[in-house]
């Protein structure tokens, strides 16, 4: 086990002091005495006064330029920082509080508590740059994580202790789905949750904090935010800060941990900004040449070790709905399950707008989920795939040109498509409909019956946003009554 970082600020180089020689936005060059050059990733502190307010800037060493000069990235705005200002090497990386003290509180990327200033600074702290567990400590996981969301449990089952990606463009429901997952899992989950808000909207962070407080799950959750209005250095490091807190719960307290990250794309985006500021030549589509390395360093630490696990749910924005973009494409390789949110499905009013044909899970195998689950999931996909193939014919020639068999299949596929949607708990205040939680066995039974045609005579609209088939029958009677 790596030794914990304490509050001792004594530098290995004797708290060496340097001076600022250049400031360009968040990039600060600092000159140190010969033989006292700080190591890469060390945190440096600079005291400044702006409009009569004194504050301490944190800089992270990014490059050694030679001639005793280091190039750093500031974690806060550099307004008020001037050439010649004194900079002190702390002798350690950015460190965050760890342990039970972080539960129920909101922190920034530097480990400062935002709702209770000073909290955790006199206790144990860990540096945010850490090595992943060694190969012999890792443990493979194949246990299904039941969510109560039909489309996920049936077609893209999540792995306990695995990494799950929620992919989607702007406005298709990534944040709503991740909030729903927090609500559902945290209520039944006995361990600790850590939420990392990476470069997303401050408003969403506030909403999440209030909702978790209202649901009664905040006392077992640590929230770490580096939002849109913060410098790229902060947005790049906030995921590591949250992950460090999660690693403590896994490695020291031997807990199963839930780690939510919203949004991984903003982590990549911040890395791209920092790379440009450091003068690196951009790679494909303007991203940093170190994209795969940076993603790997983060993802390799999010893993399960013997006897304990980190289950990670990561929202991943897909720019311009282009899945070949290097940012989402680099993330795919690290995930156990991918849930792709589709704009055409969301435009039909089906939520969650999960694309059942492109979403995947490595545990959707008969040897893991069972023969019946596997067979029903494949039959649902077969019907939906056939419907997709017929859509061009329907659009050009109309339904009348289809064979009787295909007409039946299209009607069944439309019912299945609508039945894959359901009401969410977090959306109750907007829809006025209670959220539904459907057990996995019921989901398998219900979809098996729909696939066999038992409900072909029910109107399609009866399947909208329903939980189980009981809800469908009630909706059908209501429609018939009109």
UniProtKB/Swiss-Prot annotation:
<dbReference type="GO" id="GO:0046933">
    <property type="term" value="F:proton-transporting ATP synthase activity, rotational mechanism"/>
</dbReference>
<keyword id="KW-0547">Nucleotide-binding</keyword>
<dbReference type="InterPro" id="IPR003593">
    <property type="entry name" value="AAA+_ATPase"/>
</dbReference>
<comment type="function">
    <text>Produces ATP from ADP in the presence of a proton gradient across the membrane. The catalytic sites are hosted primarily by the beta subunits.</text>
</comment>
<dbReference type="Pfam" id="PF00006">
    <property type="entry name" value="ATP-synt_ab"/>
</dbReference>
<dbReference type="GO" id="GO:0016887">
    <property type="term" value="F:ATP hydrolysis activity"/>
</dbReference>
<keyword id="KW-0139">CF(1)</keyword>
<dbReference type="Pfam" id="PF22919">
    <property type="entry name" value="ATP-synt_VA_C"/>
</dbReference>
<dbReference type="GO" id="GO:0045259">
    <property type="term" value="C:proton-transporting ATP synthase complex"/>
</dbReference>
<keyword id="KW-1278">Translocase</keyword>
<dbReference type="InterPro" id="IPR004100">
    <property type="entry name" value="ATPase_F1/V1/A1_a/bsu_N"/>
</dbReference>
<comment type="subunit">
    <text>F-type ATPases have 2 components, CF(1) - the catalytic core - and CF(0) - the membrane proton channel. CF(1) has five subunits: alpha(3), beta(3), gamma(1), delta(1), epsilon(1). CF(0) has three main subunits: a(1), b(2) and c(9-12). The alpha and beta chains form an alternating ring which encloses part of the gamma chain. CF(1) is attached to CF(0) by a central stalk formed by the gamma and epsilon chains, while a peripheral stalk is formed by the delta and b chains.</text>
</comment>
<feature type="binding site">
    <location>
        <begin position="168"/>
        <end position="175"/>
    </location>
    <ligand>
        <name>ATP</name>
    </ligand>
</feature>
<protein>
    <recommendedName>
        <fullName>ATP synthase subunit beta</fullName>
        <ecNumber>7.1.2.2</ecNumber>
    </recommendedName>
</protein>
<dbReference type="Pfam" id="PF02874">
    <property type="entry name" value="ATP-synt_ab_N"/>
</dbReference>
<dbReference type="InterPro" id="IPR005722">
    <property type="entry name" value="ATP_synth_F1_bsu"/>
</dbReference>
<dbReference type="InterPro" id="IPR020003">
    <property type="entry name" value="ATPase_a/bsu_AS"/>
</dbReference>
<keyword id="KW-1003">Cell membrane</keyword>
<keyword id="KW-0813">Transport</keyword>
<keyword id="KW-0066">ATP synthesis</keyword>
<keyword id="KW-0472">Membrane</keyword>
<dbReference type="GO" id="GO:0005524">
    <property type="term" value="F:ATP binding"/>
</dbReference>
<dbReference type="InterPro" id="IPR027417">
    <property type="entry name" value="P-loop_NTPase"/>
</dbReference>
<dbReference type="InterPro" id="IPR000194">
    <property type="entry name" value="ATPase_F1/V1/A1_a/bsu_nucl-bd"/>
</dbReference>
<dbReference type="InterPro" id="IPR050053">
    <property type="entry name" value="ATPase_alpha/beta_chains"/>
</dbReference>
<dbReference type="InterPro" id="IPR055190">
    <property type="entry name" value="ATP-synt_VA_C"/>
</dbReference>
<comment type="similarity">
    <text>Belongs to the ATPase alpha/beta chains family.</text>
</comment>
<keyword id="KW-0375">Hydrogen ion transport</keyword>
<dbReference type="InterPro" id="IPR024034">
    <property type="entry name" value="ATPase_F1/V1_b/a_C"/>
</dbReference>
<dbReference type="InterPro" id="IPR036121">
    <property type="entry name" value="ATPase_F1/V1/A1_a/bsu_N_sf"/>
</dbReference>
<dbReference type="GO" id="GO:0005886">
    <property type="term" value="C:plasma membrane"/>
</dbReference>
<keyword id="KW-0067">ATP-binding</keyword>
<keyword id="KW-0406">Ion transport</keyword>
């Amino acid at each position: 086990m790596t030794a914990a970082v304490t509050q001792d600020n004594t530098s290995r180089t004797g708290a060496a002091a340097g001076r600022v020689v250049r400031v360009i936005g968040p990039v600060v060059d600092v000159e140190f005495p010969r033989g006292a050059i700080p190591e890469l990733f060390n945190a440096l502190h600079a005291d400044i006064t702006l409009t009569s307010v004194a504050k301490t800037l944190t800089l992270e060493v990014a490059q050694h330029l030679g001639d005793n000069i280091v190039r750093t990235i500031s974690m806060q705005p550099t307004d008020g920082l001037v050439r010649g200002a004194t900079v002190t090497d702390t002798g350690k990386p950015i460190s965050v509080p760890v342990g039970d003290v972080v539960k129920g509180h909101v922190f920034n990327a530097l480990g400062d508590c935002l709702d209770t200033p000073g909290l955790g600074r006199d206790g144990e702290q860990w540096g945010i740059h850490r090595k992943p567990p060694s190969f012999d400590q890792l443990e493979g996981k194949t246990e299904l994580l039941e969510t109560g969301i039909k489309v996920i449990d049936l077609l893209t089952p999540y792995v306990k202790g695995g990494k799950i990606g929620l992919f989607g463009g702007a406005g298709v429901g990534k944040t709503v789905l991740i909030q729903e997952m927090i609500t559902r899992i945290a209520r039944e989950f006995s361990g600790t949750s850590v939420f990392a808000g990476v470069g997303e909207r401050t408003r969403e962070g506030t909403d999440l904090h209030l909702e978790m407080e209202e649901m009664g799950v905040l006392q077992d959750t640590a929230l770490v935010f580096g939002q849109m209005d913060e410098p790229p250095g902060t947005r790049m490091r906030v995921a590591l800060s949250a992950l460090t807190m999660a690693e403590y719960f896994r490695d020291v307290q031997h807990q199963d941990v839930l780690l939510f990250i919203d949004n991984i794309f903003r982590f990549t985006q911040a890395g791209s900004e920092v790379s440009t500021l450091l003068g690196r030549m951009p790679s494909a589509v303007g991203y940093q040449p170190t994209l795969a390395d940076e993603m790997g360093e983060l993802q390799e630490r999010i893993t399960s070790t013997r006897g304990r696990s980190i289950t990670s749910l990561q929202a991943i924005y897909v720019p311009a709905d282009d899945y070949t973009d290097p940012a989402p494409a680099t993330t795919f390789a690290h995930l156990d399950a991918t849930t792709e949110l589709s704009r055409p499905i969301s435009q039909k009013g089906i939520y969650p707008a999960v694309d059942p044909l492109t979403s995947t899970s490595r545990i959707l195998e008969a040897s893991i989920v069972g023969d019946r689950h596997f067979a029903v999931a494949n039959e649902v996909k077969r019907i939906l795939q056939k419907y997709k193939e017929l859509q061009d014919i329907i659009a050009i020639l109309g339904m009348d040109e289809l064979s009787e068999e295909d007409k039946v299949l299209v009607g069944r596929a439309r019912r299945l498509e609508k039945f894959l949607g359901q009401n969410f708990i977090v959306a109750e205040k907007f829809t006025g409909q209670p959220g539904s939680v459907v057990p996995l066995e019921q989901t398998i039974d219900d979809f098996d019956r729909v696939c066999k045609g038992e409900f072909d005579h029910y109107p399609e609209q009866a399947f909208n946003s329903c939980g189980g088939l009981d809800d469908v029958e009630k909706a059908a009677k209501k429609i018939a009554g009109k």
